[in-house]
Regions:
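N-terminal amphipathic, basic-rich helices that act as targeting or association modules
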Residues: 2-114
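Cofactor-binding active-site loop characterized by glycine-rich and histidine/acidic residues
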Residues: 71-75, 79-199
Length: 199
């Protein structure tokens, strides 16, 4: 007999500490469910978040923009306007938007495919990303990188080889330490890459 998986949605258990102010710029505190973070041999982050209504609207607006870009890319791909692969991240917009809010502009980020939203959040433009998908010279990699091989000054690309971004990210982090910068490198990978030898 198969064991049933218990699924718990923590977003619906988020609550406000005190009252929500009328002003959009006045901060208030959200209390996240204690189940929001699982940790192993490390302290989890605080489950309290101080934010304003204006900031929440801005985050939501960015997520909607990222979704609309990915939907446009999907339509273009289905209409055969995009050559090669087109790896979308529809439904994962909050990851790119949330990370960009948490890290510094000079921090480095590297990932695998499904990187369009990270490219835009790290300084690329939606028009540049779409031009890249269409193979245009105005694309972020001059139309030669396609869906995966796109770069901005602190985004070191999606990577076409599953898990290959991990050793590259390690090298970026080592360079930051060697140069004594006050920056971090974030290397992102998914379930499939977690079983690769270099990870």
């Amino acid at each position: 007999m198969l064991a049933a998986r218990n699924i718990h949605l923590v977003a619906d258990s988020t609550r406000v500490k005190g009252a929500v102010p009328e002003s959009g710029s006045e901060p208030f505190t959200l209390i996240l469910s204690e189940d929001s973070f699982d940790s192993y041999k490390i302290d989890p982050p605080s489950n309290e978040l101080t934010i304003t209504k204006d900031q929440l609207v801005e985050l939501y607006s960015e997520m909607v923009k990222m979704r609309r870009m990915e939907v446009a890319a999907d339509q273009a791909y289905k209409n055969k306007l995009v050559r090669g692969f087109c790896h979308l991240a529809i439904g994962q917009e909050a990851v790119a938007v949330g990370m960009e809010q948490a890290i510094k502009p000079d921090d480095s980020l590297i990932t695998a495919y499904r990187c369009h939203t990270f490219v835009v959040q790290r300084g690329g433009t939606i028009s540049g990303m779409l031009a890249e998908l269409f193979g245009r010279e105005g694309g972020l990699s001059k139309g030669k990188g396609g869906s995966m091989h796109v770069y901005t000054p602190n985004f070191f690309g999606g990577n076409g080889i599953v898990g290959a971004q991990v050793p590259l990210g390690t090298g970026l982090a080592f360079a930051q330490k060697y140069l004594k910068t006050n920056h971090a490198t974030f290397t992102l990978y998914g379930d499939g890459a977690s079983n690769q030898g270099q990870v």
